Amino acid sequence: MAQWNQLQQLDTRYLEQLHQLYSDSFPMELRQFLAPWIESQDWAYAASKESHATLVFHNLLGEIDQQYSRFLQESNVLYQHNLRRIKQFLQSRYLEKPMEIARIVARCLWEESRLLQTAATAAQQGGQANHPTAAVVTEKQQMLEQHLQDVRKRVQDLEQKMKVVENLQDDFDFNYKTLKSQGDMQDLNGNNQSVTRQKMQQLEQMLTALDQMRRSIVSELAGLLSAMEYVQKTLTDEELADWKRRQQIACIGGPPNICLDRLENWITSLAESQLQTRQQIKKLEELQQKVSYKGDPIVQHRPMLEERIVELFRNLMKSAFVVERQPCMPMHPDRPLVIKTGVQFTTKVRLLVKFPELNYQLKIKVCIDKDSGDVAALRGSRKFNILGTNTKVMNMEESNNGSLSAEFKHLTLREQRCGNGGRANCDASLIVTEELHLITFETEVYHQGLKIDLETHSLPVVVISNICQMPNAWASILWYNMLTNNPKNVNFFTKPPIGTWDQVAEVLSWQFSSTTKRGLSIEQLTTLAEKLLGPGVNYSGCQITWAKFCKENMAGKGFSFWVWLDNIIDLVKKYILALWNEGYIMGFISKERERAILSTKPPGTFLLRFSESSKEGGVTFTWVEKDISGKTQIQSVEPYTKQQLNNMSFAEIIMGYKIMDATNILVSPLVYLYPDIPKEEAFGKYCRPESQEHPEADPGSAAPYLKTKFICVTPTTCSNTIDLPMSPRTLDSLMQFGNNGEGAEPSAGGQFESLTFDMDLTSECATSPM
């Protein structure tokens, strides 16, 4: 089967990763239209040899023409349009650089192959991988359903056989007592014993049949318990474990976890069958008490059967007690498992055995670090108390689906203060954002004469005392849940394991896709890989340490990779979300790549990218222009940070940005958003209409005010147009200029002044204070 066909059969979790591989550089439509031909070419060789790359590129254009002819015959107007547009784009972008398209296609094919290998590994492991394919999950669930149906049928069949045995035993008991009574009378009267012997033989035959029936039932019960054990192992060790792993992935931004209802139905069905079987085993005890004999199989095997069924039911109930929603502060729903002292957090537990008789019977108690208190003290970790409503009764009324659950909405943590300021050991090896703590939930179940202690734990949480610790705390949560499925390893960061770039890349993309509508493309991830690992061709399998990811400063920078990236994520969510969702922000792109794609474009073409030097997160635009001699120049403006974007939206900055030459003529250098989208088309809808910016003047006022608006201007000189400043701190002076009418001071490190002008909209000219 062709690679592309195999990819389309994967689960949606994998398809999400597949979508991230493709962008405008290599459209997915082209991959779809020419799948067999693309897979038959040696793109890796073409990426290293220009003559072969040129040949393959021209062959690609020929294949596009042939496919266009097919669509023409089919009268498929939409596909004709898309294919023509794709060809024009490829010619304009790669005609002079065929090796570039070869590298892109080679990397996409390699990533596709890696994706298939991951899916195949999940299939071989029987669904215990993070994201099994849809086919594996469906087949496994169907088999599980069949096994559960088989268990239920066998339980019902045994129920019928138990009735048959009971009737046979009653007949035997009646005949035996009757014969015994008659035998006593005959002994008194001295009558012939022949009739008695005949009836004794009949009783012996009945006893033999009864013994065979008992042995058959005991054997079937043993087989039934083995079948239950197999189904239970599948449910708890595979299905439930897989759900818990998916919950971990969902906590760090991965695909949303599936609901527990189906798993609850399966576990409830098995629990009901186990209780019914336990009653059948108890029935055997009653039968034994009425009739027993030498070699009775009930006497020999019933205690063992009773012990097995009770153990199975206990273990099932313990496994069925889960944390449905991990601890999370309501103000930070996208960052669960990070809790700030003194701030309320919520969590929810659920029992996946839906017995109505347990409604309002189970009282849940919450505590923290129950089993790790001594360990925590040894390693110098802080200790906490849980405040608020830390006990609650499970009920079925609070859940929409009637599940047996308890939601805690008003919990807070308070640190236990010690003499040295809270930490039990001043020589603690871990910083506070690497300390892991467990929140424990406990209850007791009394059901049908059984007492079962239930206990479950949250995933490890990080407790912070200041919100500025959130980025590093979240990095700890990412690293832990990315690399382990052990739910209780609180000593994880004493020796944090190493991750691979493939793992890190997936998690980084989730940080965007979970809070926006767009993850990271393969090109964006490659740029991030260069930031972390340095220049390279193939980053797959490259190892990344915890220190490299979060603690060590990047080369030539005074901050770590994660601090830089986390601030960019925050910038996207709070200030430029709509533009990011539209795909207008290229974001992560190297300066070499930026120059390469802009140098072939007409003057005025610009792109939007994130700053590589701003610790707090910044976004800038880079455009192409021609100098006096006609030479192509690539210019960038100093990045805009959150402080500046608080005063003016990025779309309005782009729409109003101007360059002022020595003669005070204002020119807009931004015309087309890369590759060729008119600026007004892309950003106009995100700017406020002038009627909203300038309400009508009061008719009763003596003289109406002139309408004004702020624009961002970079002053320059004719002799130095090729040296446009990298730092127009335009919005830093916005409020000052608006208040006193004076221009901004020259930027501290810039060669030129950066001004925000107040434009007179009536005369359409700049009112310069200079």
Swiss-Prot record:
The modification N6-acetyllysine is found at K49, K87, K601, K615, K631, K685, K707. The modification Allysine is found at K601, K615, K631, K685. GO terms for biological process: acute-phase response; astrocyte differentiation; cell population proliferation; cell surface receptor signaling pathway via JAK-STAT; cellular response to cytokine stimulus; cellular response to interleukin-17; cellular response to leptin stimulus; cytokine-mediated signaling pathway. It is found in: Cytoplasm; Nucleus. Changing S727A: Decreased transcriptional activation. It holds the Pfam family STAT_bind. Signal transducer and transcription activator that mediates cellular responses to interleukins, KITLG/SCF, LEP and other growth factors. Once activated, recruits coactivators, such as NCOA1 or MED1, to the promoter region of the target gene. May mediate cellular responses to activated FGFR1, FGFR2, FGFR3 and FGFR4. Upon activation of IL6ST/gp130 signaling by interleukin-6 (IL6), binds to the IL6-responsive elements identified in the promoters of various acute-phase protein genes. Activated by IL31 through IL31RA. Forms a homodimer or a heterodimer with a related family member (at least STAT1). Component of a promoter-binding complex composed of STAT3, NFATC3 and NFATC4; complex formation is enhanced by calcineurin. Interacts with IL31RA, NCOA1, PELP1, SIPAR, SOCS7, STATIP1 and TMF1. Interacts with IL23R in presence of IL23. Interacts (via SH2 domain) with NLK. Interacts with ARL2BP; the interaction is enhanced by LIF and JAK1 expression. Interacts with KPNA4 and KPNA5; KPNA4 may be the primary mediator of nuclear import. This is Signal transducer and activator of transcription 3. The gene is Stat3.
